Amino acid sequence: MSNLIVHGGTPLRGRITPSANKNAVLPVLCATLLTQAPLTLHGVPDITDVRKILDIFRTLGSDVRMDHASGTLELHHKDTAFDAAAHRLPEEMRSSIMLVPPLLARFGVARLEDNVKGCTLGVREIDPHVEVFRSFGGAVERAQGSLLVRCAGPLHATHHWLDYASVTTTENFVLCAASASGVSTLNNAASEPHVQEFCRFMTMLGVRIDGIGTSRLTVHGGAALGGGEFRFDEDFHEITTFLALGAITGGDVVVRNSAPENFPLIDRTFAKFGVRIEHADGWSRAHREGPLTVQTPFTSNVLTKVEAAPWPYFPVDLLPIFIALGVRAQGNAMFWNKVYDGALGWTGELSKFGAHVFSSDPHRIVTFGGNALTPAVVESPYIIRVAIALFMVAASIDGRSEIRNATPIRRAHPRFVENLRSLGVQVEWTSEE
């Protein structure tokens, strides 16, 4: 377990170039198995989940050449081989489920651990993925603590309607559809920026996809797939994180941002706490006039609300970042996670700083800002943005705080501590058995 120790109270100042979004990188890596042509990917972050997938590729016999210094990855899956009896996909990464479609397409079989994990956000069902695999002609069964997915012949085109706009299920549909001859359509598809980035990679391979960025995708499958080069965009989660860190500490942080078109709702949510975001010339900056203050709604007798749901709603993954702003702001605000049933249990840790947070139900909390906060030792669950949110609060308080179990940060932010130090923060990793 790794912990973060921070000496807070220093306004952050400087410029940051964010890394790529792991939620785009991981599905793209899985998709590379579909082609036997050489590929070069630029901007690949040196994070734990990437290393795990590359280790899988090496085990399967793929040619993997990763330059961690430059973030350039060369892949060639020409000699890849899969044996369902010998090879199991790791359960500790939820993204490993996206290796199933390319393995099905190339080898007719995939074996997946029965308890696929990820961040501890509550129950995360595997059934929607099973429905997609079956829709394309796959057979799914349980065997010796794992899920065995088989396909007797080529995958066939299909039309499918998701009951929930799931990111990974959408990506699994596209991966299956790319290998299935004919036209497949998906309704209620996820449309997050990282899903759009993944779809752009698929089009580079030679897959025609209509409706990218909408809730209806049409995939023309069965074409021979090629190779090429692809460069990842900056992670909008990390952009938002460093803008929020600048705002909560009263500093001045400028963040590289080549896709400000994804930020109108994020910008309006910052404005609810008295923070104005400026985008210019490929960079973004947070401006704060005076203390953080929750803006009073025009409607009488209601709280300012931040409601998080699938894109184009406010992104669920960013909700903890704004909860941190809420406990530091003057005024009260309600935060509503409309997706996960176990994602707000951590907010009790904020009371250790002296914050006042009321849990309405598993999906909603209310922050009562304005309390004088003090340094503390807090424990993060295994949720990336929660560890960062606890760090944000600690960084805004004079004195030494410790964020225990901050390990999940390494899953998404390869240079988090180095970037913080460049902005003037006194912070260090510590480890314990």
Label for each model-derived stretch:
Residues 1-433:
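Short, structured segments at the rim of ligand-binding sites
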